[in-house]
Amino acid sequence: MTTIVSVRRGRQVALGGDGQVTLGAVVAKASARKVRRLYHDKVLAGFAGGTADAFTLFERFEAKLEKHQGHLLRSAVELAKDWRTDRILRRLEAMLVVADHEATLIITGAGDVIEPEQGLAAIGSGGAYAQAAARALLENTNLGPAETVAKALTIAGDICIYTNQVHVIEQLD
């Protein structure tokens, strides 16, 4: 598993993830890139779950963004519909967090599209730890989104054995 967290302050949004990939009880890779920029660098996306499944979803989501001229919510809903109804896609085990200047969304394998409260989203094995840390930081500091994401990932990595301290963080200003 992994940890992906997204934090929003105003129109600024940051999304980050750790780099650990495990195969059973073994760390197979420590520096995987689970966070990407999509649609002309206007959308951030991160995944938790099976790597091959996530890349399939990234490709599908990017195609939806192109089809709908970068409209995040419409693209997410269309991906979720496909994910829920397509027999092959239904078997994919991954979740996505996607964000642009206007919204942050969680897209699940069950076909749910969720806009989290407070501009804060977290998924993966360390997601609850990262979410709690980010929420405390948002409420009690003036850190920017990228700094908040970095600190939340560090805390999650200290607690969750499936999350490491190799971080990739992207921000939209």
UniProtKB/Swiss-Prot annotation:
Q: Catalytic center at which residues? A: 2
* One of the GO BP terms on file: proteolysis involved in protein catabolic process
- Where, subcellularly, is it found? Cytoplasm
Q: What controls its activity?
A: Allosterically activated by HslU binding.
Question: What enzyme class is recorded for this protein?
Answer: hydrolase
Manganese is among the record's keywords: no
Does the entry feature the keyword DNA-binding, yes or no? Answer: no
Give the catalysed reaction(s), semicolon-separated: ATP-dependent cleavage of peptide bonds with broad specificity
One Pfam family of this chain: Proteasome
Question: Which UniProt keywords are listed?
Answer: Allosteric enzyme, Cytoplasm, Hydrolase, Metal-binding, Protease, Sodium, Threonine protease
GO MF entries: metal ion binding; threonine-type endopeptidase activity
**For this UniProt entry, what is the primary localization, expressed as one broad class?**
cytoplasm
Q: Look up the domain of life of the source.
A: Bacteria
Alphabetized InterPro entries for the sequence: ATP-dep_Prtase_HsIV_su (IPR022281), Ntn_hydrolases_N (IPR029055), Proteasome_sua/b (IPR001353), Proteasome_suB-type (IPR023333)
In short, the EC number is 3.4.25.2
- Which GO cellular component terms are attached? HslUV protease complex; proteasome core complex
Tell me the residue numbers annotated for binding Na(+). Answer: 157, 160, 163
NCBIfam families xref list: ATP_dep_HslV, PRK05456.1
Give the family this protein belongs to, as stated in its UniProt record. Answer: Belongs to the peptidase T1B family. HslV subfamily.
| Stated role | Protease subunit of a proteasome-like degradation complex believed to be a general protein degrading machinery.
- Subunit structure, briefly? A double ring-shaped homohexamer of HslV is capped on each side by a ring-shaped HslU homohexamer. The assembly of the HslU/HslV complex is dependent on binding of ATP.
The identity of this protein, by name, is: ATP-dependent protease subunit HslV
Provenance organism = Nitrosomonas eutropha (strain DSM 101675 / C91 / Nm57)
